[in-house]
Amino acid sequence: MSRIGKKPIPVPRGVEVTIAEGNVVTVKGPKGTLIQRLPPEMIITHENGVITVARLSDQKQHRALHGLTRSLIANMVTGVTEGYQRVLEITGIGYRAVREGKNLILQVGFSHPIRVTPPEGITFEVMERRSANEPQQVIIRGIDKQKVGEEAAKLRALRPPEPYKGYGIKYREERVRRKAGKAGKAR
């Protein structure tokens, strides 16, 4: 039995969960609404403020989907109550981010600035640098964990951190393994 799949999901006050035909789960909360179609092989029940997930059989695929389904529902409940965020750090001489309306303008060493338009349900926040040596932070917020992570990965992919000076865009919690530069010529 899946250890994660067995755990019941408590539904906090102010969150409304509906399970429609075909395992279409709708979660409404203070921050918004999320709708997700989940695998039909799972049995999802909502009783007494608790959601439980069970599987039809003990097949390998059903065992794999059991924990996944439970995690997806738990992420939806967390998303509509607390929301999700990823923090990116921009490091480099002349590298900066500016918010223009909803859009994000990045100057990260290309000959032109890069304009990033957020998808539906995602917001960007740009923190100003406190000192010249500190990296600039961009916060990506939203209620859908997958969209927040995907948008953060797309921004990081524009200029991944390089190992020699550490310039580029990285996640706040990411550690960049630094390399030594060229060794001097021996005489």
From Swiss-Prot:
GO terms for molecular function: rRNA binding; structural constituent of ribosome. Keywords: Ribonucleoprotein, Ribosomal protein, RNA-binding, rRNA-binding. The keyword rRNA-binding applies. GO terms for biological process: cytoplasmic translation. Part of the 50S ribosomal subunit. Belongs to the universal ribosomal protein uL6 family. NCBIfam families: L6_bact. This is Large ribosomal subunit protein uL6. It comes from Roseiflexus castenholzii (strain DSM 13941 / HLO8). The gene is rplF.
